[in-house]
């Protein structure tokens, strides 16, 4: 058995704008999660071509310990909380696989994302068979809804309900911003359809861990997209060449940060 959810994140930007904004935000957020021996190590970031599909391939290692719940830390052997993330970004489609060498075939997280120029109304964009699609829970993430944010994660300067973009004149996003966006044809819009499939095969812990991971994925998607919108004035003028240069610099920074200082960023909200 696997647990599958589809998260839909609507944003007031175009699919083209989002490509730069998402890469910028991931690089910045990585720095906030790295330090004290934990965090993100970038092994590869290079173009790929496979069966006619072209894009950017990344291989990252996540060194975790304090970022997993206590009930996992208690039973996990030393050195086992290291996760490999491989991503194939053939934008506007992206596929990410997370694995763990200790658990081998008993664990994976698969995130498949389609970025579409709509308001999150398309059904089964990932083309699942009807029986599988019936089991998928759809979760709508509203980046302007503070009630969807963990209290410990809230930052006023990363709140789309308060933020106004000087460069694009977008925001702040009120309670009915999606309806207003639907009635404003000249403002860009898009939706990230993120299909998350989780397998964790460990007797007695399976459903608890699978639900914990899905909860954490929602938390990550919510926080990242709130940041992405509120950082729009920092990335809206950047090109993909700028982003690749920034990623190279970030890779070096992360390596230095991970080896010193204290643990930073999100800790596990124990489920």
UniProtKB/Swiss-Prot annotation:
It is found in: Golgi apparatus; Golgi apparatus membrane; Endoplasmic reticulum membrane. InterPro entries: PI_transfer, PI_transfer_N, START-like_dom_sf. Keywords: Acetylation, Endoplasmic reticulum, Golgi apparatus, Lipid transport, Lipid-binding, Membrane, Phosphoprotein, Transport. The modification N6-acetyllysine is found at residue 215. Constitutive phosphorylation of Ser-262 has no effect on phospholipid transfer activity but is required for Golgi targeting. It catalyses: a 1,2-diacyl-sn-glycero-3-phosphocholine(in) = a 1,2-diacyl-sn-glycero-3-phosphocholine(out); a 1,2-diacyl-sn-glycero-3-phospho-(1D-myo-inositol)(in) = a 1,2-diacyl-sn-glycero-3-phospho-(1D-myo-inositol)(out); an N-(acyl)-sphingosylphosphocholine(in) = an N-(acyl)-sphingosylphosphocholine(out). SUPFAM superfamilies: Bet v1-like. The modification Phosphoserine is found at residue 262. GO terms for molecular function: phosphatidylcholine transfer activity; phosphatidylinositol transfer activity; phospholipid binding; sphingomyelin transfer activity. GO terms for cellular component: endoplasmic reticulum membrane; Golgi apparatus; Golgi membrane. Coiled coil: none annotated. GO terms for biological process: in utero embryonic development; retrograde vesicle-mediated transport, Golgi to endoplasmic reticulum. Catalyzes the transfer of phosphatidylinositol, phosphatidylcholine and sphingomyelin between membranes. Required for COPI-mediated retrograde transport from the Golgi to the endoplasmic reticulum; phosphatidylinositol and phosphatidylcholine transfer activity is essential for this function. Belongs to the PtdIns transfer protein family. PI transfer class I subfamily. This is Phosphatidylinositol transfer protein beta isoform. The lineage of its organism: Eukaryota, Metazoa, Chordata, Craniata, Vertebrata.
